[in-house]
Amino acid sequence: QQDGNWSLYLPDIEYQSRNGLETYNCTAFGTLNCIETLIRRKYGVIENFSERFTGIAAGTRPPGNSPHVVCDAIRDKGLIDERVLPFGSDIDIIDEYYSPYPLTAELLYAGKSWLDKWEFTHEWVVYPSTKNKQKELSDALRYSPIGVSVMAWRQNNDGLYTKEKGEGDNHYCTLYNYEQGEAWHIFDHYDNTNKKLIWNYDFGYAKRFSMKKIEVCINKPTFFDSLKNYFREIMK
């Protein structure tokens, strides 16, 4: 995506806090939004994966988790469709949300089936000590939407979200576009899902992703296989 703008491929809005329940599952929501956007852009497939499954697989509990742990859980346990393990209106207790724990054999099998079809990789783009974060992020946006850690949320008089240099982060979401020298565009999973951040926003951590569909190789019969099959047929 040479212009770094993934806005046409963003998934449907899903909130991490519903039914009066805060899930603390922002690392799963932010990561899956990036994955769903990337798959839609590369393969034209609209997916909606279960953040509950990913949170359980990653061992997420209040007050949250590391995006790196979440990504490694995806590489180990895969993903499943939201409809298989949804965040329904009946779930209003944290122990209900993060259940079943451990995951059932059926859910694990569904996740492993996804791994048979997709190759998922991830890598850090920005650390707190990274120099020229703006260049690193704008370059990385050519290849995927970016999972970013942020300090949620403080607005200035222009309606842009700000963060002082060195402030700690407490949230994780999706960076999907930028205006050079002006603002960063964020897709969030709280109210006001589309946010603009000041250009010199001091992101703490940022991670890019890669998705590749695994081609199923079907071995073609050799000449000798065909010959054996031919004689087998005529000898019947």
Feature locations, PLM:
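Predominantly the structural core of cysteine protease catalytic domains
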Residues: 60-233
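Short, hydrophobic/amphipathic alpha-helical packing segments
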Residues: 31-35, 169-172
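Intrinsically disordered, low-complexity terminal tails
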Residues: 1, 235-236
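Active-site-adjacent structural segments surrounding the nucleophilic cysteine of cysteine proteases
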Residues: 1-27, 32, 38-60, 79-109
